[in-house]
Amino acid sequence: MKVSSHAMVPTHEIIPREEIPLLLEKYNIKLQQLPKLLDTDPLVLEVEAAPGDVLKITRMSPTAGESTYYRLVIATSL
């Protein structure tokens, strides 16, 4: 089963690497300040993201409209 096919799961997409500096500049942050998402997360696996990738997550809300947020994919440490 594809996790992304569930109605409650927001859209996840990988941001092209060349756009990451623009995102960081826009929000005046460093890459490591982004919230993290493990590389073992089912949606990370589904979109084939790798550690170092940034995911753009877009959620629809009946009250807030469209909400976009970003997560940095990190490797799982043992």
Curated annotation (Swiss-Prot):
GO terms for molecular function: DNA binding; DNA-directed RNA polymerase activity. Its EC number is 2.7.7.6. It comes from the Archaea. This is DNA-directed RNA polymerase subunit Rpo5. DNA-dependent RNA polymerase (RNAP) catalyzes the transcription of DNA into RNA using the four ribonucleoside triphosphates as substrates. It catalyses: RNA(n) + a ribonucleoside 5'-triphosphate = RNA(n+1) + diphosphate. Part of the RNA polymerase complex. It comes from Methanococcus maripaludis (strain C7 / ATCC BAA-1331). Keywords: Cytoplasm, DNA-directed RNA polymerase, Nucleotidyltransferase, Transcription, Transferase. One of its GO terms (cellular component) is cytoplasm. The keyword Nucleotidyltransferase applies. The lineage of its organism: Archaea, Methanobacteriati, Methanobacteriota, Methanomada group, Methanococci.
